[in-house]
Amino acid sequence: NTNVLVTVEPGVVRNANVGIVSNAQINESVDEMNLLAQTATGDTDVVATQILLQTDPGAYASSVVAVSGPANPYALPTTLMLGMSEAGDVAMERLMQLRPQMTAPQAPPRQRGSGGPRSTAVAQSVASQRRKAFGAELNGPTPDEGMRGWARGFGFAGSSSNQNWAQTSYDSTLGNVAAGVDTVVGDGGILGGFVGYMPGSVNVTGGLVDESMTVNGVDFGMYGSWVPNRGEWYLSGAVTGAYTMIDRTRNIYVPGVVRTATSSSNAWSASFMGETGFNLPTGGDSYVSPYVRVAYTDFNQGSYTESGAGSLNLAVGSQSASALQPSVGARYMDGIRSGRSVITPFVGAAFTAFLPVGDWGVTATNPFSGLPPISVYGDVETLYGGSVEAGVELALPDGLTLFASFNGMFMSDMQVYGGRAGIQIPF
């Protein structure tokens, strides 16, 4: 049992816990470490000798784990994949726009066109027809009246107690500020694009090693939606990509060998997602909308080499990871008239899952990575749980729209809390 306390240096005590390790694995590793200490020179000899001074089997095993690989190579892909699906969802989310319009009287459409103002009678006729269509008034003017620009953002903080990777846990934050524009395509269709800035961080803690990552990225994509004229159901989707720069610090806390390794890497990510649902009236201007959403996300990180930690520096190979994120849920929203403005509170909940696809493994090498492995690692974890949302949208006269919401996700070994906000402006 590696769940023991280790005095790293005066005043610094760490829990060496990396799980349960067999005595046979430890004995085989010690034999090879002795051989390395006898044949190696320089810093490799110094580190091997210090590790062999760990008389507690648990402390020895945790020391080998700390010096021979990254702290948790699953934490960064998981965080960025959740962020990519969030960015796509925020971009394509249209709330009441994808529902039938409210039945209360509305102002005539804004006057446009080079041929002069439209007559009141024509405007009222057009408005009457559009009351039967989907509720674009709550996200700007009806699409065939013009284009709409928007600025939206999200931010979330997550924590994970991952038991599959050497007993590590990690905290993460990720934000996004994006701007986009969309317009009508065909009958009842919307097509748009966006670009945004995505900062964040991932901090891994476990055993005798910590790893912190600072993330800065640019994301971009296209999205669209389609609603039949009566608004009984809808279809929406998004395709997003991101280029991310990662600055990394790995702190090793082996007694006698306290080191810090730094590195930088780049990653590309892509996400494909779609959602479809029904609009079920519950009286007045209230609707329940059951929906199904599926997202597929792919992550590819380039290789990198650490510096600053002597023989403990790792040369880490490229990494590829993919995941499916299905959700089944429902939203309830109620449109409330306030003069010519519309206030729409909404709530929602869904069952959701994070299903890793393929092998997420990564190869890391240094003088100690070739030792017999101490098997404390597991595969990337499949997550199941639920998500919730609660917010309000305010549609002002002439199409200006604002919204804000709280969003949370509660999954096995992971909790994520955050929010969304945005503004949409017709032009």
Predicted regions and their residues:
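Outer membrane beta-barrel translocator domains of Type V secretion systems
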Residues: 52-284, 403-427
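Outer membrane beta-barrel transmembrane domains
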Residues: 312-427
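Extended hydrophobic secondary-structure segments that form protein cores and membrane-embedded regions
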Residues: 149-150, 237-239, 290-294, 345-349
